[in-house]
From Swiss-Prot:
PTM (free text): Proteolytic cleavage by caspases in apoptotic cells causes loss of endosome fusion activity.
Annotated protein name in UniProt: Rab GTPase-binding effector protein 1
Keyword field contains Electron transport: no
Positions carrying N-acetylalanine: A2
GO cellular component, one term: endosome
Modification Phosphothreonine, positions: T408
GO MF annotation terms: growth factor activity; GTPase activator activity; protein domain specific binding; protein homodimerization activity
Cellular location(s): Cytoplasm; Early endosome; Recycling endosome; Cytoplasmic vesicle
SUPFAM superfamilies given in the database record: G protein-binding domain
Organism: Mus musculus
Coiled coil (UniProt feature): 11-345, 534-816
GO biological process: apoptotic process; endocytosis; Golgi to plasma membrane transport; protein localization to ciliary membrane; protein transport; regulation of postsynaptic neurotransmitter receptor internalization; vesicle-mediated transport
Family according to the record: Belongs to the rabaptin family.
Residues recorded with modification N6-acetyllysine: K282
Amino acid sequence: MAQPGPAPQPDVSLQQRVAELEKINAEFLRAQQQLEQEFNQKRAKFKELYLAKEEDLKRQNAVLQAAQDDLGHLRTQLWEAQAEMENIKAIATVSENTKQEAIDEVKRQWREEVASLQAIMKETVRDYEHQFHLRLEQERAQWAQYRESAEREIADLRRRLSEGQEEENLENEMKKAQEDAEKLRSVVMPMEKEIAALKDKLTEAEDKIKELEASKVKELNHYLEAEKSCRTDLEMYVAVLNTQKSVLQEDAEKLRKELHEVCHLLEQERQQHNQLKHTWQKANDQFLESQRLLMRDMQRMEIVLTSEQLRQVEELKKKDQEEDEQQRVNKRKDNKKTDTEEEVKIPVVCALTQEESSTPLSNEEEHLDSTHGSVHSLDADLMLPSGDPFSKSDNDMFKDGLRRAQSTDSLGTSSSLQSKALGYNYKAKSAGNLDESDFGPLVGADSVSENFDTVSLGSLQMPSGFMLTKDQERAIKAMTPEQEETASLLSSVTQGMESAYVSPSGYRLVSETEWNLLQKEVHNAGNKLGRRCDMCSNYEKQLQGIQIQEAETRDQVKKLQLMLRQANDQLEKTMKEKQELEDFLKQSAEDSSHQISALVLRAQASEVLLEELQQSFSQAKRDVQEQMAVLMQSREQVSEELVRLQKDNDSLQGKHSLHVSLQLAEDFILPDTVEVLRELVLKYRENIVHVRTAADHMEEKLKAEILFLKEQIQAEQCLKENLEETLQLEIENCKEEIASISSLKAELERIKVEKGQLESTLREKSQQLESLQEMKVNLEEQLKKETAAKATVEQLMFEEKNKAQRLQTELDVSEQVQRDFVKLSQTLQVQLERIRQADSLERIRAILNDTKLTDINQLPET
């Protein structure tokens, strides 16, 4: 009866729980609707963004396509411009050749004409000098005869005078004087005629010289004009050469970049090669460890064998030797051609080293034969002939190593191992033209592994350049736990055998089956020992491939260096041609500039002289004008001073008369007393003294000024006369100089006009060149802009793709969240339905306990 009482409480709690779940479900539904709305909005926004980005990408692609079309058009224009430049270059070369030929022809004609004219002038001058000297000699002889006759006549006259015949002497003297006058006329008249003729010839010669100089100047002017006309072509050719130089420099830069890339690849190959060397060294250590273990096992088996078993082993060895010899002969016949080719490739130094290495091998093995007679039959096949030092195959080498391992002496064959290893090392060097130091201890270790034929690895002598590391020596010399166990077992067995009965020689200590099994194991061990591991062969193949790649890389580097050298040679050749052309252009320009500069200097000198004369004339004129102005000013001052003095005098006279009249007009009252009169007299006297001193001072001052002005006027008058005379002379000189300079001015104006024309043509050509360069720079800038725009478009596309991927991931996440909400709402609806259908509280509790809302992944699928 007590149970029905509390039953309504679970119902109330259950109803509350249901109400809460319904509220939660309603909230979830509202959240779901809100999320669906947000998702639809975001989806619409994403769609709009996607469409907008697609339109932007299409527009950018259209812009990029247009830019590429423009770039192609610009490239075609650039190619056309380059073709035009090539044509201009050809035209320039042809014009240069024709111009040079014409210049040489003109120079040759001018030199011939000048030489002929100089010869004619020299001949005429020489003839004139000879005739003149002859006439002078004749005249001297005539005058000497005339002087002698005159002296004789004078002596005769003196004698006659002494005799007193004065009248007759006078008549005779008159007659003789007339005769002398006639003789003088007869001599002087032809002389005057000859002098006039010589003057005429001299004027004609001077006229010819002037004509020749004028023709020479005309030819030089013509040559100068031709040089000026060709200068533009030369400048165009120089511009073409500059463009070629820039193109060649760009090619050289490209080749340098390619060479740098090849060097970088070569460095990467070297790093890979070093890594391969490291792995090879590890494999080599592993192989040496296995070899050491096999050798220890061989030694232990050899200790166990009896003398009969050793004899049988010797017989088997002899059979193997015969088979090996037969195989060796067959291989020698088959590989004869390849061996001859290899011997041709191997250097002489390698052959000498192989012969030297074979000699100590034979000596060492003879020493072994003399010391250890029991193993003579085993060591006899190791003496290699000097003509075929590399004829053994790898299998033969490992068989020999097996036989060496079965001998009693472990120290006798280290020199043979060294010589074989050296021989293989030299062969490797000759094959790849590489030094052993390029590969380190790896190649030496490989040669040792291929030619291993000794027992004691502790006494092993490696080839030059190879040294075992401490870890390798420790790994070779150390014993494994299994080896220690076998060594202890063998030591116990040998001690038991020493204490036990020793069987006579020829009897076996083991059975036949055990012996056969032992022989098989030995044979298998020998085969395993002679067979190379797959890892080593793979490493060797990789090493060969790397060597081939390195050789190809070196060949490529050599080719690139050759191409770079050819490009540099071509660049130097073009630079040399350009330098020669520039030198010729400079020489021609210097010649023309020298001629122009000479004329310009003359014109400048005349202009300077004219300017100096004008300046001196203007300076003298200014000085005279200044002096005249000073004189006029001083004159005006003197006249003003004179007027002022006259006015002062007049004013003083007027003032005096005025004062007198005033005094007379005033009612002058005489003093009454003597004292007052005395004071008045003293006062007047003082005033009179003051007036007199002032008048004296003024008079002296005026006299001094008048004298100074008179002297100044006289000096200025003299200076004026001197200046007028000097200025008159300078004016006359200036007129003469102006008359001489006017012609030079006209010539200078003509030269300036020609120079201006040349400068204008040069300026036009330079402007054309600058326009072409600007066009080239604009094209390059446009190309750079287009490439930059392309890069930016690609970057933008990449960013848009990333953005689209990010939006896609967000969309996927939102879809997953929506699915989770849907899943959760469905689960809650199912649970509510199950709760509604539940018939008891325990069932509801079980349903609620089974429901786990901590993880969405744990919800069951509905």
